[in-house]
Amino acid sequence: MNTCTTIRNNWQLDEILELFNTPFNDLILRSHLTHRQFFNNNEIQLAALLNIKTGGCPENCRYCSQSAHYKTDLQKEALLDVENIKKAIQTAKNSGADRFCFAAAWRQLRDKDIEYICNIINLIKSEKLESCASLGMITLDQAKKLKNAGLDFYNHNIDTSRDFYSNVTTTRNYDDRLASLNNIYEAGINICSGGILGLGESIEDRAKMLLTLANLKEHPRSVPINRLVPIKGTPFENNIKVDNIDFIKTIAVTRILMPKSYVRLAAGRKDMSEEMQALCLFAGANSIFYGEKLLTTPNSNCDDDKNLLSKLGIKTKEPVLLNSQN
C-alpha cells in the first residue's frame, strides 16, 4: 500500500465511490495511515458549542428543531447576553476545551449584530481558545469584519449533495451555501464545513458531498460529520438511523480526501458505543464536540468522554490555529 499522501483538489466521483466500495479493513487502514502522516495519532481536539440564539429560524431544513416551520418541543430563546456567554466560555476552557464555537438560528448574519458578534470573538480570544462562528449566510464584507475581530473559523455546512439538497430544504439553494463558503475563504477565515448522514441520502450523495468539499479552492480546515438525531415534529423524525459501519466508512473517506483537515464527530455521538467511537478515531476523526448539549440535542456526558479518551490513551491538543490559514 502506498502510504505517501498528496493533497488534491481534483477528485473525481468514481474515485470516491471506489473508496466507499473498498473492503472495510483496507479502507480504515489506509485512512489511519493517512491520518498519521499529518497528525499526532493519539491527540484529539475538544470543541465546545454554545447556542447564542435558539429557535425561530425562517429556514425550513427538514431535520432541524429550530425551524419556525415545525412544531417541536423547543422553546424559542432570544440572544444571550454577553455575561452569560463569557461564563460559558470560561466553563468550556476549565473543562478542557481548546476550541469554542457559537451558533445562532439565523438565515444570515445581519449587519446590526456585527458588533455583538465581534464582542463574543474578543471574549473567546481573551481565553486563548480557537473561535468558530456559525451564523448562517455571510457576505464578504461581513466576513472581513469578523476576520479583523480575530475569528479563526466560520462554520457553514453543505449538509448533503447538490442533487439531494432540495429534499432537505427549499428556502435556500446549494449555490447560496457555496457563495458564503467562498466569501469566508476570500476573507481569510478558516472554513468549517461538513454534512449530515441519515437525511435519506444515498451513498452516492455522500460521495458527492465530500467531492464538493474536497474540491474547494482549499480544503476546509474543519469537517464536522453529523449523524441525524431525529427530532419529533420535524419531517425527518422517522428517518432510519445510519448504519454504524457506513458511518465509520464515511469518516475514513473524509480523512483520505482531506488529509490535513480536522474531522469532527458532531451530532449523534451520544448514541454511539465506545467501540464505534474508537473505530471512528482510528479511521481518522480527531475532534469531538465536548459538553452535554449540542445546540438543541443531547451530547455525550463529559465524564464518559474523559473515561473513553483515557482508555484509548488519547490526549487533548493545544489551540494553534489562531486567526490564520497557515
Curated annotation (Swiss-Prot):
It catalyses: (4R,5S)-dethiobiotin + (sulfur carrier)-SH + 2 reduced [2Fe-2S]-[ferredoxin] + 2 S-adenosyl-L-methionine = (sulfur carrier)-H + biotin + 2 5'-deoxyadenosine + 2 L-methionine + 2 oxidized [2Fe-2S]-[ferredoxin]. It is an enzyme of class 2 (transferase). The keyword S-adenosyl-L-methionine applies. InterPro entries: Aldolase_TIM (IPR013785), BATS_dom (IPR010722), Biotin_synth/BioAB (IPR002684), Biotin_synthase (IPR024177), Elp3/MiaA/NifB-like_rSAM (IPR006638), rSAM (IPR007197). Keywords: 2Fe-2S, 4Fe-4S, Biotin biosynthesis, Iron, Iron-sulfur, Metal-binding, S-adenosyl-L-methionine, Transferase. Its cofactor is [4Fe-4S] cluster; [2Fe-2S] cluster. Pathway: Cofactor biosynthesis; biotin biosynthesis; biotin from 7,8-diaminononanoate: step 2/2. Its EC number is 2.8.1.6. GO terms for biological process: biotin biosynthetic process. Signal peptide: none annotated. It comes from the Bacteria. GO terms for molecular function: 2 iron, 2 sulfur cluster binding; 4 iron, 4 sulfur cluster binding; biotin synthase activity; iron ion binding. [4Fe-4S] cluster binds at C57, C61, C64. [2Fe-2S] cluster binds at C101, C132, C192, R264. Residues 42-266 form the Radical SAM core domain. Binds 1 [4Fe-4S] cluster. The cluster is coordinated with 3 cysteines and an exchangeable S-adenosyl-L-methionine. Binds 1 [2Fe-2S] cluster. The cluster is coordinated with 3 cysteines and 1 arginine. The keyword Endoplasmic reticulum does not apply. Pfam families: BATS (PF06968), Radical_SAM (PF04055). Homodimer. Catalyzes the conversion of dethiobiotin (DTB) to biotin by the insertion of a sulfur atom into dethiobiotin via a radical-based mechanism. HAMAP family: BioB. PANTHER family: BIOTIN SYNTHASE, BIOTIN SYNTHASE, MITOCHONDRIAL. Belongs to the radical SAM superfamily. Biotin synthase family. This is Biotin synthase. It comes from Ehrlichia chaffeensis (strain ATCC CRL-10679 / Arkansas). The lineage of its organism: Bacteria, Pseudomonadati, Pseudomonadota, Alphaproteobacteria, Rickettsiales.
